[in-house]
Amino acid sequence: MDKWLWHARFCKTRAIAQDKVTKGHIRLNGQRVAKASAAVRIGDVMTLASSGKVVYLRVLGLGLRRGPAPEARTLYEIIEE
C-alpha cells in the first residue's frame, strides 16, 4: 500500500506513506489497514484522511514506477471529496 500511495503521488516518500498507514489515516475497502505492506488491488476503494479532508477513491491501476503527475492520475478515480 505504501508503494501504491507513493506511485500515485499521494505521498512524497514511501516513509511518509508508511507513517500515514500505521497511524490509521488510510482505509482500504472500509477497513483500517495495520501494515503498510497490505496488498492493493484494482477496484479497491481507499479512504484517505489528510489536512482535515477525507477523500474516497477507487484504484484503477497499479503503478510500475513513480512517473509524472498525469501518469499517476490514471491509477485512481476520485469518488468523493
Segments predicted by a language model, with ranges:
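A basic, amphipathic helix-loop patch mediating RNA/tRNA/ribosome contacts
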Residues: 1-42
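C-terminal structural segments of small proteins and small subunits
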Residues: 52-81
